[in-house]
Amino acid sequence: MKTGFNDATAMKRSNLALDLQFCEKYNYDYIEIRLDMLQEYLKTHTMDDLKLFFAKSHLKPYALNSIENINFCDEKQWKKMLELFVFACKMAKELQNPYIVVVPTMGDDMKNKTYKEVFDDSVRVLKELSDIAKPYGVKLAFEPIGDPRWCVRSMKQAWEIVKEVDRDDVGVVVDAFNLYMYNKLEDMDDIKEVPLEKIFVFHIDDSEDIPLDTLDHCHRMFPGDGVIKLKELIQLLKDKGYTEIASVEIFRPEYWEMDVEEVIRLGYEKTKKVITM
């Protein structure tokens, strides 16, 4: 597998320019760029600056993060989401960035949606977004979020949706923490049902050992520092033939307060150690 860094991991004290500098220094293969950080970068840099960096570097862009709350939008929400999505498509094309991560909707009211309502809406929306993305040559990586407030939580549910969409440019994100957050990865076998070519992105992260009903994204940890069965998950992916990105994505306030270079260095070293076990 190849190493990747998601901008979220050091975002409170960092920026895209710093992430690029240190990811290159510590020999990451890929970076996942956050759209908000890209927009901030473009206030003081140009796209040509960014394209020139990637042209000269071994570091390459992999997935833009993320288009969120795609389900059950009203007209105003849909318009706002589409504006960001089209921006992401344009940026992806210019940067030769192959994927955009898309995320289901979060809200307490999502708990009241039926399985069929979520399925039907997700299929419809992903097809519409796929139609928009196709001319730009970018693929959509649909990410289930394990927290009960999100409407698509499990790999089984996400894969059923993506399978029904049946587009070459729509696949899934395997995020270790999100799958653990759903049911402690007891459904790991569900990943076996997803064809290799439909696994677009792998987010590697770990978790504190606390009850699921209090677990939140702030409890993410560096790979190998927590209780997720990463060795088994990675072996499963390797057995399927997966050789692409293992991208460290963490939303831990403690890491956000650390020195940016230290976070990026540790992310590389710990990810590399886990994926080569």
Specify the residue positions occupied by each region the protein language model found.
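Histidine-acidic metal/acid-base catalytic patches
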Residues: 1-4, 9-27, 96, 152-174, ...
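Active-site-proximal loop/turn and secondary-structure-junction residues that shape catalytic pockets
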Residues: 9-11, 35-37, 67-70, 104-108, ...
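Active-site acidic/histidine proton-transfer and metal-coordination neighborhood
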Residues: 15-17, 55-56, 73-171
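N-terminal substrate-binding region of glycoside hydrolase catalytic domains
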Residues: 22, 26-42, 65-70
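Conserved beta-strand positions in the central sheet of alpha/beta enzyme cores
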Residues: 32, 63, 101, 141, ...
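Glycine-rich, proline-tolerant flexible connector loops at the mouths of alpha/beta enzymes
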Residues: 32-54, 106-110
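Alpha-helix N-cap and loop-to-helix initiation/capping positions
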Residues: 41-45, 49, 76-84, 113-124, ...
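Catalytic-core regions built around general acid/base machinery
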Residues: 45-57, 125-132, 190, 194, ...
